[in-house]
Amino acid sequence: MHVILYQDNSVPVVKVEVMYGVGSKDDPARKTGFAHFFEHLLFEGTANIERGEWFKIVSANGGRNNAYTTYDLTTYFEIFPSNQLELGLWMESERLLHPVINQIGVETQNGVIKEERRQTQDNRPYGNLISEVTRHLFPGTGYYHSIIGSIEDLDNATLEDFLNFHKTFYMPNNAVLVVAGDFKKDQAKRWIQQYFGPIPKGESIMRAPFVSHPITEQINAKFEDANIQTPMMVLAYKTPPADSREAMVLDFISSILSDGKSSRLSKKMVDDKKMALFIGAFNYALKNSGMYLIYGLPMGDFTMDDLVREVDEEIKKLQNELITEREYQKLMNQYENNFVQSNSTPEGIATSLATNFTMFGNANRINTELETYRSIKPEEIREVARKYLNPNQRLYLQYVPESPKPAPVVEEPAPVIEEPKVETPNAMDPKKKPKKVKKPKKSKKK
C-alpha cells in the first residue's frame, strides 16, 4: 500500500482517506454496478464493527465520513478531530482486512441502490444523459455503462460474484492511504504500521487492455426522457485520457466556450441571439480515454440543429484563429483560482494527492499541475481544437421528451384499487446509543 502523509497543524483536524484503483470501468461483463455497489457495501460492518454502527461511531467521536465512485476509482474517508487519528486508521484497516460481506448486506444495499438509481438517474430530468453518451462513445469497453450500473445485473448477481470482485480489487497493492492535517508524523507512522502492516498486499490485478476505436463519421442518436419537457442538444467527442497534456488544453477550451456569461457560446447564444436557455461545455477526462461534451437547451422556435450550427461556427473560429490576450489572461486567472480553492484545506489536498497517485501514478503532480496549465499557449488551443472537435468525430445526441403514448382502450370501468401504505421503520433511532466499540490496541512505546 502506498502511504502519503501531509502535515498541516494549523487546525486540529485530520483526514484519513483510502482510495482504491477500481471504478465502474472494472465492472465484469453483465455485472455492471459492482464498484459502486461496494462503495455502499463496505459500510455494512466488519468483524469488529457491528452492522449499522459505522456512522454512529464516526459521529459519536466528532467526525464525518463519506465515499464516492467514479469510472476509474473508489474512495472512502473520515474527517476527525486530530486526537481521533488512531480511530480513523483503525476503521479503514477494518474495512480493508475484516469486511463482512454476506447476503443480508447485499440485499439491503441492493434496495438502497435501486432507490438511488430512481432518484439520480431514472426519475431525474436528463438523468440518463451521461450514460447515453458513454453507451455510444465507448461500446465494448468498461466505460459504456453508467457508474450505478444495471439493476437487472445487480439482481442476478450472487454472493459469490461479490466476494470474487472484492478479492480481486480491494487489497493494499491497489490502494493509497493519505493522512492529511494535524498529526505527529512518527506516531502516525507507528499506527499505520500497526493496523495496515499485517494485511497481505494481494495478488497483481490482470486488467484487459483498453481498446476503443476512433469515430470517423458523425453518430446520430436519439433518447426519449419522460421526465423532461425541453429537448437538449448534445455533442460529444472522444478525447485523450487524463494524463495527456491535450486533456488539460481541452479544459481551457471548455472555459473559453462556456465558463461564465462572457464566454463565447453563452454570450452569443444565450444573451445576444437568445437561441438557448442554457449552453455548456466540459471535458470529462478518464484514465483510459476522455469525452468532451457541449450541450444546450433551445429556446422559443429555435431547434437543436440551430444550436449545432452556432456551436460549429464557434469551434471553427477556435480552429482558425488564436484566442485574444484578454481571454488568455482570463484563463490563467480562472485556473489559478480553481487550483487554490481545490487545495486550500488539508481535506482538499488529501483528495488531490490520492487522485493524482491513483489516476497518474504520481502524487507529486499536485506540485506541477498549475505550472503545466500556465505553460499552455494559444497555439496549442487552436491545434487541439483542430485535432479533436470535428463534426465527423462526434456523437450528436438528441435528448428529447418522451413521445405521447396512445391512450389504452378500456371497455369497462377499471376497478378502484387502494394503494397499500407501507411505513418504513426508522433505522436510526436517536434514542439508541451506539454499542460500545472495541478500542484499538495502543501501540507499545519503544
Language-model features: locations:
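His/Glu-based metal-binding/catalytic segments typifying zinc-dependent metallopeptidases
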Residues: R118, R135, S204-S262, Y295
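Active-site SXXK
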Residues: T32-T46
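Peptidyl-prolyl cis-trans isomerase
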Residues: E53, H98-E107, A157
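Non-catalytic, conformational "gating/processing" segments within enzyme and secreted inhibitor domains
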Residues: N110, L159, L163-Y195, Q393
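Short, polar/flexible loop-turn hinges at active-site or ligand-entry regions and domain interfaces
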Residues: E44-N48, L96-I104, I323-T324
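M16 family metallopeptidases and their MPP-like homologs
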Residues: Y6, V11-D27, G33-F37, R51-R95, ...
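Proteolytic maturation boundary segments
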Residues: M1-V3, K184-E224, K267, T368-K446
